[in-house]
Amino acid sequence: MWKEFKEFAMKGNVIDLAIGVVIGGAFGKIVTSLVNDIIMPVVGSLVGKVDFSNLYINLSGQQFNSLQEAQAAGAATINYGLFLNNLINFLIIAFSIFIVIKQINKLKNFTKKKEEVKVEATEKDCPYCYTKIDIKATRCPHCTSVLEEATN
């Protein structure tokens, strides 16, 4: 059983997946920082110095100065500012993955076109009965017509 597990774990796909998960986690942290520390402060200052991470709807009826105070008091809140941050975070990650996948597909298609081997014709049409015959034939096996040229 250990041998089978070792073979499974050492296959290229499993290792590639593990590397992808680690890199994806690190990339997610970078994008989260980009959204929270760079994009949202700029957007917030453009719309009137608003901190999006502190935008919420208080459902408890009490007054709180910040989302953190409301959460510490156990108040029910709808945290739409955090949702906006996460939505922008998702859109950036989704767009980045789209660009990467698009480039990978372009590279695959480019290499596939290079690998395509030019296929030589092995058949031709008889000019008299229009059936497929060997390209080197001098006489049609179907209608027995003599062909003028054997094309190669």
Curated annotation (Swiss-Prot):
Keywords in alphabetical order: Cell membrane, Ion channel, Ion transport, Membrane, Transmembrane, Transmembrane helix, Transport
Source species, domain of life: Bacteria
Pfam family, one: MscL
Signal peptide: none
Gene Ontology CC annotation, any one: plasma membrane
Gene3D superfamilies found in the cross-reference section: Large-conductance mechanosensitive channel, MscL, domain 1
Transmembrane segments: 14-34, 81-101
InterPro entries per the UniProt record, alphabetical: Mechanosensitive_channel_CS, MS_channel, MSC/AndL, MscL_channel
Membrane-topology annotation of the record: Multi-pass membrane protein
One Gene Ontology term of the molecular function aspect: mechanosensitive monoatomic ion channel activity
Localization terms from the record: Cell membrane
Protein purpose: Channel that opens in response to stretch forces in the membrane lipid bilayer. May participate in the regulation of osmotic pressure changes within the cell.
Subunit and partners: Homopentamer.
Family: Belongs to the MscL family.
UniProt-recorded name of the protein: Large-conductance mechanosensitive channel
Organism, scientific name: Clostridium perfringens (strain ATCC 13124 / DSM 756 / JCM 1290 / NCIMB 6125 / NCTC 8237 / Type A)
Gene name per UniProt: mscL
